[in-house]
A protein has these predicted regions:
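Class I Rossmann-like S-adenosyl-L-methionine
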Residues: 1-308
């Protein structure tokens, strides 16, 4: 699940913090990097559990209405299509998700007010109403309902962002990327797999894990060389006056460009320009792009960089 976009973001955060804290312990910082990445995977599982919790909340409401002193006919014989959603039933018994919940002791029980509010939004939505009014019923429709609900109601949800931020500082910048993986997980679900449906693994393969470790270490261990290159290509600037975050981003970008021959230069440049837009000043993207482009051209002229 953890892809290189997320890895780059985390390395920028950890390298910046490493220098702010005096740059003393590389091993400790590396452990912090991988702990931070593991927290992103926890968030992925936690957001999958949220869909189950909302369904449970809807079911509680149906049962409460049935047990009223004088329930209406509709309350006695409600439409149970939503609470009997086959995709959610499969997700609820998923072995990997149950293992996460049991091991991490993570549930939504302490966020009951938020779950109720989210349930209200879902039950009031046109997506829900169209689904409930449909006379057809299939696993595919059940799964598609939750893809739509997640994309339109959970994906950009300010209240949820606040809940997650209060629970873990590691999740501040993760949700937007993790949301895309939750949507992928929903699409991947197949009824015939039952409780054994595989969720996305934490790392796709060892290569991505190695990428994280190597990029982080090269960034720190070769810092003097990378900063020399930056200084040489910003002669009209006092490097001490360049935003420190810009220096960190360029340092990591150079580590990637010079250490990973299979990653095209254009890919690295684009990725770090986008990161600059998130973490630095409004003009940082253009400044970083221009500086790195100048460094790349100089290295190519000196035959110190041969890839495109």
């Amino acid at each position: 699940m953890i892809n290189r976009v997320l890895i780059r973001l985390k390395i920028v955060q950890i390298v910046y913090a490493y220098y702010q804290n005096g740059g003393k312990n590389l091993d400790t910082a590396e452990k912090e990097l991988f702990f931070s990445l593991s927290k992103a995977y926890d968030l992925y599982n936690y957001l999958l559990l949220l869909m189950v919790e909302v369904t449970k909340q809807a079911n509680k409401r149906l049962n409460a209405a049935k047990n009223k002193l004088v329930p209406t006919k509709e309350e006695l014989f409600p439409n149970t299509k939503f609470v009997e959603n086959r995709f959610i039933a499969q997700l609820e018994v998923n072995k990997q998700l149950l293992e996460f919940s049991n091991n991490q002791k993570k549930t939504w029980e302490n966020e009951a007010d938020f779950v109720k509010t989210l349930c209200d939004k879902i039950l009031e939505s046109d997506i829900y109403k169209e689904y409930m009014a449909s006379e057809t019923s299939s696993y595919e429709e059940d799964r598609e309902l939750w893809r739509k609900l997640y994309k339109n109601i959970i994906f950009n949800n300010i209240e949820l962002d606040q809940v997650l931020e209060d629970q873990s500082l590691y999740w501040n910048d993760d949700k937007e990327i993790v949301d895309t993986f939750v949507l992928k997980a929903i699409k991947r679900f197949d009824e015939k797999n039952g409780a054994k449906q595989e969720l996305l693994p934490e790392f796709k393969d060892e290569e991505d894990q190695d990428f994280a470790r190597r990029l982080f270490r090269r960034t720190i261990l070769n810092a003097d060389y990378y900063r020399h290159l930056i200084s040489e290509n910003t002669k009209n600037w006092d490097l001490d006056r360049v935003a420190f975050m810009d220096v960190v981003i360029m340092q990591i970008a150079l580590a990637e460009i010079l250490s990973f021959p299979n990653i095209p230069v254009s890919v690295s440049l684009n990725e770090y320009v986008e990161i600059a837009k998130l973490y630095s000043t409004p003009k940082s993207g253009g400044f970083i792009n221009g500086t790195l482009d100048g460094i790349v051209n100089s290295l190519k002229k000196e035959n110190k960089l041969t890839k495109n």
